[in-house]
């Protein structure tokens, strides 16, 4: 019987069901040509994921049958977040129905939603004594509601177990199921609604096959219409070949659709089979874009090379009083 490595996410040890790399990306419309990667600049420094607190959080996730996007997507901030006892939880399994070539989450045929997951999640978060939590998911194009009912069930379980907890959700685009999904989430709303547009519209075909830029903007706007008291949040990764003018236009689009919170970070290639990094954006440009975003009226902006959607999400939400 195969023994799993406790330090590695279970999905990374079962390649027969969890496809990654070339096997995952073989059917995308724009083929990735592996090449020599750009050398990482000095400002991209990632700590190794070790230490007692990191091991404790990983062990807790394994024991509870839960997943974190920190591990599944190979986030560069894993050691920092796990080291402080925090994690961004990924619900609805660890297998995605899409094959986005920037993302390291596994592709395959997912299992049905686990009805016991919301309660296990609530118990784990209470055990960690978290005050702020981010819940995300894989894409579930196989489900009639895109997984929205499961998001709502998790929010209800969290509110019941930890009434003082603030909950941010980072959702997929609910392609073809937007109204059903929004009705479910409006009945059990989070404290922050996050959906990333990821990149500029020109790069969607190669970076987000199966997704639509305008639909992502519409999702943010429609949620705001249904639940006007809950702020919306979105983010982009830079370094895929976009221009600064294209990024500025995307920021204007987000503000035009009522988005209040923003994250901007550097794209990092998970493997040579993924989309290559076209450019490492210097910190000064992230600062410049942060200033531009604030001029547009974003209430909360996190913009730096290693910023990710949920990185210091509690601090970002506190700026607008969530």
Swiss-Prot record:
Comp. bias regions, Polar residues: 1-14
Where is the Radical SAM core domain positioned along the sequence?
82-299
A cellular component annotation (GO) from this entry: cytoplasm
Instruction: Please give the catalytic activity noted in the UniProt record.
Output: [[Fe-S] cluster scaffold protein carrying a second [4Fe-4S](2+) cluster] + N(6)-octanoyl-L-lysyl-[protein] + 2 oxidized [2Fe-2S]-[ferredoxin] + 2 S-adenosyl-L-methionine + 4 H(+) = [[Fe-S] cluster scaffold protein] + N(6)-[(R)-dihydrolipoyl]-L-lysyl-[protein] + 4 Fe(3+) + 2 hydrogen sulfide + 2 5'-deoxyadenosine + 2 L-methionine + 2 reduced [2Fe-2S]-[ferredoxin]
InterPro entries the UniProt entry points to = Aldolase_TIM, Elp3/MiaA/NifB-like_rSAM, Lipoyl_synth, rSAM
Which SUPFAM superfamilies does this one have? Radical SAM enzymes
Which residue ranges does the record annotate as region Disordered? Answer: 1-30
Keyword match Ligase = no
Respond yes or no to whether keyword Transferase is given for this record.
yes
Metabolic or biological pathway: Protein modification; protein lipoylation via endogenous pathway; protein N(6)-(lipoyl)lysine from octanoyl-[acyl-carrier-protein]: step 2/2
Q: Where in the cell is it found?
A: Cytoplasm
Enumerate the GO terms in the molecular function aspect: 4 iron, 4 sulfur cluster binding; lipoate synthase activity; metal ion binding
User: What cofactors are annotated for this protein?
Assistant: [4Fe-4S] cluster
Bias regions of kind Basic and acidic residues — which residues? Answer: 15-26
Chief subcellular location: cytoplasm
Question: Which UniProt keywords are given for this protein, alphabetically ordered?
Answer: 4Fe-4S, Cytoplasm, Iron, Iron-sulfur, Metal-binding, S-adenosyl-L-methionine, Transferase
Q: Enumerate the PANTHER family for this protein.
A: LIPOYL SYNTHASE, LIPOYL SYNTHASE, MITOCHONDRIAL
**Name of the protein in its database record:** Lipoyl synthase
Q: What is the organism of origin for this protein?
A: Methylococcus capsulatus (strain ATCC 33009 / NCIMB 11132 / Bath)
């Amino acid at each position: 019987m195969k023994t799993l490595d406790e330090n590695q996410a279970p999905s990374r040890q079962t390649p027969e069901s969890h496809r990654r790399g070339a096997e995952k990306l073989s059917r995308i419309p724009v083929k990735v040509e592996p090449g020599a990667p750009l050398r990482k600049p000095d400002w991209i420094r990632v700590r190794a994921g070790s230490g007692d607190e990191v091991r404790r959080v990983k062990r807790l996730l394994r024991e509870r049958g839960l997943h974190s996007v920190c591990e599944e997507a190979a986030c560069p901030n894993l050691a920092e977040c796990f080291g402080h006892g925090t994690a961004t939880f990924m619900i609805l399994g660890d297998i995605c129905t899409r094959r986005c070539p920037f993302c390291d989450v596994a592709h395959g045929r997912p299992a049905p939603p686990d009805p016991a997951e919301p309660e296990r999640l609530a118990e784990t978060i209470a055990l960690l004594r978290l005050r702020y939590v981010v819940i995300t998911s894989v894409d579930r194009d196989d489900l009639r509601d895109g997984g929205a009912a499961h998001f709502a069930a998790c929010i209800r379980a969290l509110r019941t177990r930890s009434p003082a907890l603030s909950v941010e959700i980072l959702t997929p685009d609910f392609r073809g199921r937007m109204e059903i999904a929004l009705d479910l989430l409006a009945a059990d709303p989070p404290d922050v609604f996050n959906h990333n547009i990821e990149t500029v519209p020109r790069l969607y075909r190669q970076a987000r096959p199966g997704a639509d830029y305008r639909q992502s903007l519409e999702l943010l706007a429609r949620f705001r219409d249904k639940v006007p008291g809950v702020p919306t949040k979105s983010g982009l990764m830079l370094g895929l070949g976009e221009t600064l003018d294209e990024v500025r236009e995307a920021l204007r689009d987000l503000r035009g659709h009522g988005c209040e919170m923003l994250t901007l970070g550097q794209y990092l290639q998970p493997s040579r089979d993924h989309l290559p990094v076209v450019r490492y954006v210097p910190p000064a440009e992230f600062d410049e874009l942060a200033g531009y975003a604030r001029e547009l009226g974003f209430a909360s902006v996190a913009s730096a090379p290693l910023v990710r959607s949920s990185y210091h999400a509690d601090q970002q939400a506190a700026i607008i009083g969530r």
